[in-house]
Design a protein with these regions (language model features):
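Non-catalytic protein-protein interaction scaffold segments in large eukaryotic complex-forming proteins
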Residues: 24-90
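Low-complexity, highly charged intrinsically disordered N-terminal segments
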Residues: 69-195
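A short, basic/flexible loop-to-alpha-helix module at the beginning of a structural domain
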Residues: 196-216
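Glycine-rich adenosine-cofactor-binding loop
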Residues: 217-236
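Extended charged low-complexity segments that act as oligomerization/scaffolding linkers
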Residues: 254-312
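Extended alpha-helical scaffolding regions
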Residues: 288-369
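Long, contiguous domain-sized segments
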Residues: 359-436
């Protein structure tokens, strides 16, 4: 224990010294890619994720008059490890009112549009805001014209839809739960304070209404359809029409699209995909897999035009709308670019929608700043008191993290849980902020 304490003490001391901290951070030059790009921020055409992320978060705070906190972000010298307290300040500013939440979010997204650029193959760059603003217009400059037309491919499931629908089964600890058993399991979690009462109530309502899971005629756009945690399979099983967006096959994943297309076969769903040419009756799954794919970050304009085309819009019922899921995950700076691109795609579809505005969906993350009820905090602290002795020792050494809570603006019925993971870094935090 003495040795472990000394190691942890030295680690903490070294992290406080900027010179030592930076010694272990290898700054790789950013690889220039076509499409959504970080702006030039320094000498020799340098593009900094740090200054860009700081500008977005500072602009968000200025949107609600939090100038002092915004200045603190811009003056932060150690953004890689110091971004955490600033994310907490953003959450506090959002806690003032629902109106401030919207104003702060809008200000952050608008700043991202203003400073990010859109780069085409010949190296020309233009403000992303200008490019997105001209989506669908004729006579736009060459830098904002789509480089290709995306065609529509459709693969139908071979299984017939039975009955009204049904809440999908849930596997837990080697057992499959459905119906009353699933409700009982959810209530057990709630009784043990492992989930909120509203969670158990929602599961019970879903079991009572199997018709909710008849998604025939509903159109879901999955941006990042191949993501591990995406809802592709469950939507297809419920008979939905899924418009799948993902990058083309690569050397590391040569069968990505073929494997994705096979997932629709044993379902009552329908899979709509972007392809490079018109589909023919002779195209099988392998053929379609080789010509499928579109990149959200580098083919943003092409994707927006495709989603707004007649071939996609005719799938949407007059009394319905698109449901757009933003699910791309990339490492590092790519995640920020992807989040900005997904927001632009959503905006392009919203502005062109003739029906109701699209419904937006995304997967949240536990490793960010969240609003929680006092009951959640009390339960968390109670469980921590009952933790095994070994876990308490690790916590005292700094190897196990205890939840951190901060007060909201007016200390109301909500508290703020800081679940940020420093290992993930500020790019991840900024990207998830943009999605939220």
């Amino acid at each position: 224990l003495a040795v472990l304490r000394r190691i942890e003490r030295e680690r903490r001391t070294s992290c406080k010294k900027k010179s030592v901290t930076n010694k272990y951070i290898i700054k790789m030059p950013m690889k220039l890619t076509n499409g959504v790009s970080f702006p030039v921020t320094g000498k020799n055409s340098a593009r900094s994720t740090t200054s860009t992320g700081k500008r977005i978060m500072a602009a968000a705070l200025r949107g609600v008059g939090a100038d002092k906190e915004a200045d603190a972000i811009l003056n932060e010298k150690n953004w890689r490890f110091g971004y955490r307290k600033h994310m907490e300040n953003v959450a506090v500013a959002m806690s003032k009112s629902n109106k401030d939440c919207v104003k702060l979010a809008r200000a952050g997204l608008e700043e991202a549009r203003k400073i990010f650029t859109y780069r085409i193959k010949d190296g020309k760059e233009e403000s992303l805001e200008r490019v997105v603003g001209r989506v669908g217009e004729s006579g736009s400059s060459s830098s904002s014209k789509p480089s290709r037309e995306i065609h529509t491919g459709i693969v139908y499931g071979e299984k017939r839809f039975k009955g009204q629908g049904k809440l999908p089964d849930v596997e837990y600890e080697g057992k499959t739960y459905s119906g009353p058993e699933l409700v009982s399991l959810a209530k057990t979690f709630a009784a043990q304070d492992q989930a909120l009462d509203s969670f158990a109530m929602s599961v019970e309502e879903a079991v009572k209404h199997p018709e909710w899971f008849d998604l025939r005629g509903k159109v879901f756009v999955l941006i990042g359809a191949t993501s591990e945690m995406g809802p592709l399979d469950i939507l297809l099983q419920c008979g939905a029409t899924v418009v799948a967006l993902a990058r083309k096959n690569s050397r590391s994943k040569p069968d990505k699209w073929k494997n994705l297309l096979r997932r629709v076969v044993d379902t009552p769903g329908k899979l709509v995909i972007p392809i490079t040419r018109a589909q023919t009756k002779d195209d099988d799954i392998e053929t379609l897999g080789n010509i499928a794919g579109a990149d959200a970050t580098s083919e943003l304009l092409e994707i927006v035009n495709w989603l707004n085309s007649n071939s996609i819009q005719k799938l949407v019922a007059k009394d319905s709308s698109l449901h757009i899921y933003c699910g791309i995950y990339l490492d590092g700076e790519g995640f920020v670019r992807a989040s900005v691109a997904m927001d632009c795609i959503v905006d392009g579809c919203t502005n062109a929608s003739k029906n109701s505005p699209p419904t937006l969906l995304y997967i949240d993350t536990p490793s960010h700043v969240h609003f929680v009820s006092p009951k959640i905090r009390a339960t968390s602290e109670e469980y921590r008191k009952k933790a095994p002795a070994g876990l308490k020792i690790l916590k005292s050494l700094g190897f196990a993290k205890a939840p951190k809570y901060i007060s909201t603006y007016d200390s109301s019925d909500w508290e703020i849980h800081d679940g940020l993971s420093i290992q993930q870094g500020p790019n991840y935090a900024v990207a998830k902020f943009l999605q939220r």
